[in-house]
From Swiss-Prot:
Induction details: Expression is positively regulated by the cluster-specific transcription factor caaR.
Family of this protein: Belongs to the iron/ascorbate-dependent oxidoreductase family.
CC cofactor: Fe(2+)
Assigned EC number: 1.14.-.-
GO BP annotations, alphabetical order: small molecule biosynthetic process
PROSITE patterns xrefs: FE2OG_OXY (PS51471)
This protein's pathway: Secondary metabolite biosynthesis
Coiled-coil regions listed: none
GO molecular function, one term: oxidoreductase activity
Annotated organism of origin: Aspergillus niger (strain ATCC MYA-4892 / CBS 513.88 / FGSC A1513)
Keyword set, alphabetical order: Dioxygenase, Iron, Metal-binding, Oxidoreductase
The name this protein goes by in its record: 2-oxoglutarate-dependent dioxygenase caaD
Domain Fe2OG dioxygenase, residue spans: 172-279
Length: 322
């Protein structure tokens, strides 16, 4: 039986933001909408994030993960309640997975003072032994660039749903976003159930993924043909996918799709997903007829605890991780 070859589309955003682009704004909007309807995934070029900022971010990943294990463990995210810091190998098992993920991670969010600690809110933690220009500086610069990119991508999404960009005013004013720096070891495991990241959906708004160029591994499930579609790791190209919140808030029109990672490269593989959720206090901007009053925080909080079998605890009293 012949298997239909499916690819995740690549879209040049310059057609939307640059008047001199040969692609029209309407074409870009239509391409993004089609990808959201079929895959819940698309790749973007012409995004406005400099190649230098991307390369510095990946170099910062290597700098951190090359630290001795005991130094990384000192920054464990289990030592705080707002999900910042280091997560070691095997410490996460996605809801749909059988075995723990074979990866290590480091989480960064908006850097807030301790008197503002709350659900997913608080200060970042940093490795003091690493010079600022080798880690914290590049990470913070990348964070700011991705905050802006998330806003731009969301604008294209809502225009594709027939809404004016202004509908996002309250949603993007103080958008919550989290970086998850990742290192996957070389895949030498013989158990076919072991993955760098097991099959899962993301449960927030947008995910914007930076991949280590040439280090392939991401696969997206295509239900209609029951196949896993490889998404290549190409320099200066981001992978965008929609989370469960977008699927819910569009009444299932836009997809939050299963995906997984199996490191197919020789040697280690780095990746940096940015989870861009919008303002935690904002309600649904994607469906003006939604009268539920559910906020971004309401949705994420429920998924956060349910998917990881954690009790509904007070954030200031119990350390939790996602």
């Amino acid at each position: 039986m012949t298997v239909t070859k499916i690819e995740i589309p690549t879209i040049d955003l310059r057609g939307y933001y640059e008047p001199t682009s040969p692609t029209s704004k309407e074409e870009v909007v239509a391409q993004v909408r089609a990808a959201c309807l079929e895959h819940g995934f698309f790749q973007i070029e012409g995004h406005g994030v400099s190649l230098e900022v991307q390369r510095n971010m990946l170099a910062a990943c290597k700098t951190f993960f090359d630290l001795p294990t005991d130094q990384k463990a000192e920054l464990s995210l289990y030592k705080n309640t707002w999900r910042r810091g280091y997560e070691g190998y095997g410490e996460q098992t996605p809801h749909h997975a059988v075995l723990p993920d074979q990866k290590e991670a480091f989480f960064v969010g908006r850097d807030l003072p301790e008197d503002q600690i709350g659900f997913l809110k608080g200060p970042n933690v940093w490795p003091e032994q690493v010079p600022t220009n080798q880690f914290r500086g590049p990470v913070e610069e990348y964070f700011e660039a991705l905050l802006k990119l998330g806003h731009r991508v969301m604008e294209v999404l809502v225009v594709g749903m027939g809404h004016p960009p202004s509908i996002l005013d309250s949603f993007t004013g103080n958008a919550a976003m989290f970086l998850k720096l990742l290192r996957y070891p070389e895949h030498t495991f013989t158990d076919p159930r072991v993955f760098g990241s097991g099959a899962h959906t993301d449960y927030g708004g947008l995910t914007i993924l930076l991949q280590d160029p040439g280090k392939h591994g991401l696969e997206v499930y295509h239900a209609a043909t029951e196949q896993w579609i490889p998404v290549p790791a190409v320099e200066d190209r981001f992978v965008i996918n929609l989370g469960d919140m977008v699927q819910r808030w569009t009444d299932g029109e836009y997809k939050s799709n299963l995906h997984r990672v199996l490191n197919k490269a020789s040697g280690e593989r780095f990746a940096v997903p940015a989870f861009w959720h919008g303002d935690l206090e904002a309600t649904n901007p994607l469906n003006p007829n939604d009268t539920s009053g559910e906020t971004v925080q309401d949705f994420i909080r429920k998924k956060f605890y349910r998917d990881y079998s954690l009790p509904l605890a007070e954030e200031k009293g119990t350390a939790v991780a996602v």
